[in-house]
Structures are given as structure tokens and as C-alpha cells.
Amino acid sequence: MRLPTLRQLQYLTAVIDEKHFGRAAEKCHVTQSTLSAGIQDLEDLLEVGLLERTNRKVLTTPIGEEVADRARQILSLSDDLVDLAQAEKNPLAGRIRIGVIPTISPFLLPRVLPKIRKQLPELEVLLIEDQSERLLVQVENGTIDVAILAFPFNTRNLNYRVISQEPFWVALPRQHSLSKYESLQPHQLPINELLLLAEGHCMREHAISACQLPASAQRRSVQATSLYTLIEMVASGLGITLIPQMAINSDMVRHADICLRPLKQDSLAKREIGLVWRPSFRRTSTLEQLALSFAEAMDETSD
């Protein structure tokens, strides 16, 4: 029985991802005719149509979507085989793809990447920034190997390890009435002034939990797409927000015309930071070193 080749599966997923034969061919480093022939051979082998070809765009058939999903899993397992062999020869070398959420990446990566380069000089690190749920999907389908997330968050059947926790701080307009206090309790925060990130950002859920917001207040709250936007809105006097401790010494915050106050230490307004990876990802030495590097960087943000 003839089986699809990995190359054919790569061609198919590339076309579906790029939605364009030319860009897919460039991604696969082949000519467009070679890529088209490879996909045609795959369709002939499976005896189903995977793509609908028009003059303007590429459409995927329903069975094509299902085949592509399985193809990504197969390609991911194939990558894992190569990684496993690489880890046997040199556990701390090779390539690793890391996803990081937007409320961590700008504050932690500048600290942690120099550590990784120093401690793991033969490791090639590829980075992607995205929201938690989309990063989990990418870990599951093998697009990335590890995700750096904030918890609590449902990691489904993936492995995870918490490496640190950090408290939230309150960002206030400088003339706000709460600025006279050295620290604050969550119950002191005026709910009607609280600015939150939009749905899909896990820090939104953490802030809601920390402040024990009722559902009605959650719907009323202004929603922003980035922490930078929230900080600028606070500086303009439009409300207050919570920011993670790792952000308080960043240029974004230090140069903003705002007042920062910690939430009291006995408060539950904290988040945990950790790594998430597939059970089939066996490069334990690399994971251990990554966890150590990120934990060290987290410690530095609390100084």
C-alpha cells in the first residue's frame, strides 16, 4: 500500500496556511509546479479532492481540512523524532520553538534570552507571541514546542510546570484618591473605574478573579488589546488597571504619568508563570534549563 510522503503533507499544510500556491512554494523552497504536482499526487493517492482551485484564491474542502489536521500531527511527530535523536547526541543543542503571551514577552524576554544564549550557546530559539489559547493549540499541533503562560489556565492534556509567581500592582492616575495609600486591598478598588484587557487575554481573567468582579461589572469594563494601551488610558485619567510585577520597571511603565501601588502581600491577586509542552516532547534537559533561565529572570523582576 502506498502511503503519503512527509513532503506531500508539508505541501498541503503550507498551501492551506498561506492560502496561496506561490507563497506556499517559497515556504517549502520548491517551485510552484513541483508543489502543485505533489498535492495532485496526494489527492490521487487518497482519491479525494483536498483543495478547490480558483483563479483568485485557494479553498479547502471539508475532507481537506481533516486531512490537513492529521498531517500537522504527523509532521509534528516527525519533528519530535528528529528532536529526540538530537537530544540523544547533544541534549542542549538544536532548535526549540517557544511561544510567549503578550503580557510576559516584552518584560521577560529581554532578561531571559541573554541567559539562554550564554547557558545554551548551541540552542537555536525561535519565538512567537500570541494569546494563551492559540499558543496551546500550536503546542498541541506541533507548531511550537513550549509555551510560556500565566496560570491558572486550563492546559487540557498538556504537561506544565509552574516556575514562579508574581503579584499584581495597581496603576492609578497620579491625582487619584487611592494614591495616598502605600498599598491596597482588592476590595478598595473602584470596580466602575477598572480597565481590563479584551477577552482572550488570560490576564483579564486573572484581574477579574483578583478583584472578584461581578458579571455586570465585567461587561461594563473598558476592554483594551494591549497592556500599553491600558497604561496610556490610566495616564489620561480614564480609570485604573492591574499590571504584573514584571512590568513595573519597564520603560513603558517608568515613563508613564501614573502612580503604582502594590496589592497587599496577603492578597490572592497573583498569577503563576510556567511552561507548557506536549507529553511527546522528550527533551527534558532542555526544558530543565529553560525553566531555570526563566525562573532566574523572574527573580530579577522582583528586585
Regions found by a protein language model. Give the residues of each.
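Central regulatory/effector-binding core of bacterial HTH transcription factors
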Residues: A93-R156, A224
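Secondary-structure junction motif
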Residues: E193-P214, R283-S293, A297-T301
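A late-sequence structural motif
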Residues: L108, C259-S302
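Alpha-helical linker/hinge and terminal dimerization helices associated
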Residues: L45-L46, V67-K89, L290, F294
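A short LG(V/I)-centered, amphipathic sequence patch enriched
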Residues: E43-T60
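Hydrophobic hinge/microswitch elements
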Residues: Q131-I144, L149-A150, G200-R261
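Beta-alpha-beta core module
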Residues: T155-V162, E166, Y181, Q188, ...
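Short helix-boundary/capping micro-motifs
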Residues: T13-T34
